[in-house]
Amino acid sequence: MMIASFAIFLSHIIFITYATSNQRYFKPNMHNNMTITIRRTITKTATAIAVLHSDNGNINGTIHFQQDKNSTTISGEIKGLTPGLHGFHVHQYGDTTNGCISAGPHFNPYNKTHGDPTDEMRHVGDLGNIVAGADGTAHIDISDKHVQLLGPNSIIGRSLVVHADQDDLGKGVGDKKDESLKTGNAGGRVACGIVAISA
């Protein structure tokens, strides 16, 4: 009788231990699955800023960059410009020791010719034109899929430059064609600033 009772008691212990162990086995898996799902919904966002000015201090502006999954938004305003269109580009170097000329050529990691921002054949740094109103202020709101703040072709540490003239977007003809495919015939550099990581 004692042996039978002990066997029943032992079977209860074994059953209870198995059930408890089974619950402990599934709970971490449920937790891990939830964690993985949450992590997959997180997207990387990066932000940067460029404070632009001219050598004489008459032109000033602040431009903000925000990169999400699909594109980079470029926004802000620049004051003190002559009314009209001005070429707007990211240049190779974050060097302004000799003014904007030290910034080098357009940022062009894929060795393409200059073009319209909507063209596939364009420099990464080609942002087209900005428009200054009668008061000399240009309001900027650009979305660009080529400009990146993350990765090997990041524009962080490079220069953002405003030019004196309108960018012809690589469509120049005749004696202007060669320069059009390099700079868009956008003229001198009137203001610039280094693109830096923002807080």
UniProtKB/Swiss-Prot annotation:
Entry note: cofactor: Binds 1 copper ion per subunit. Binds 1 zinc ion per subunit.
EC top class named in words: oxidoreductase
Localisation: Secreted, Extracellular space
Binding site for Zn(2+): 106, 114, 123, 126
Organism for this UniProt entry: Brugia pahangi
Protein name per the record: Extracellular superoxide dismutase [Cu-Zn]
Disulphide bond pairs: 100-192
Role of this protein: Protect the extracellular space from toxic effect of reactive oxygen intermediates by converting superoxide radicals into hydrogen peroxide and oxygen. May act in the parasite defense by neutralizing superoxide generated by activated leukocytes, thus acting as both an antioxidant and an anti-inflammatory factor.
Family classification: Belongs to the Cu-Zn superoxide dismutase family.
